[in-house]
Amino acid sequence: MRLLRILIITVAAALALPLAQASAAELLMYRRDGCPYCVAWDREVGPGYNNSSFGKVAPVRMVDVHGARPQVALKSPIIYTPTFVLVDEAREIGRIEGYSNNDFFYGTIARLIGQLPAAARSGLSASQ
């Protein structure tokens, strides 16, 4: 029984480790409570982003600027919210500071995803 408990704890710890680090391609959305632009993104983009071709390549993960942060090599500090940081293998590829509208967001994220290595972009259709 003790061995089983140790095995379960070990497996659970191994599964939780990737949550602490940004790996593969993902879009980190740094946000804070009370941010009106974060709320606008949540309303206009959030519901469909992870199901879009861009979201399949770089799913979004919410990061509270006042909470625990993933281990990512950022090019500069996070100052504004929202700030969207595209990362690949825990390294910043590029970012979008602020949110104005759906069209600007998707146009900019398309450009950023185009900077990913080809293997990371493999889920993106040629038409986007």
Question: Where are the language model's segments positioned?
Answer:
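Cleaved targeting-peptide boundary
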Residues: 22-33
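C-terminal segment of classical bacterial N-terminal signal peptides
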Residues: 13-22
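Non-globular targeting/processing and membrane-anchoring segments
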Residues: 10, 23-25, 39, 76-77, ...
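Short pre-active-site segment immediately N-terminal to redox-active cysteine/selenocysteine motifs
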Residues: 31-37, 80
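A short, hydrophobic beta-strand/beta-hairpin element that forms part of a small beta-sheet core
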Residues: 80-95
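Typically the conserved alpha-helix immediately C-terminal to a functionally engaged Cys/Sec
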Residues: 39-54
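Thiol-based oxidoreductase modules, predominantly thioredoxin-like and allied folds used
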Residues: 30, 53-70
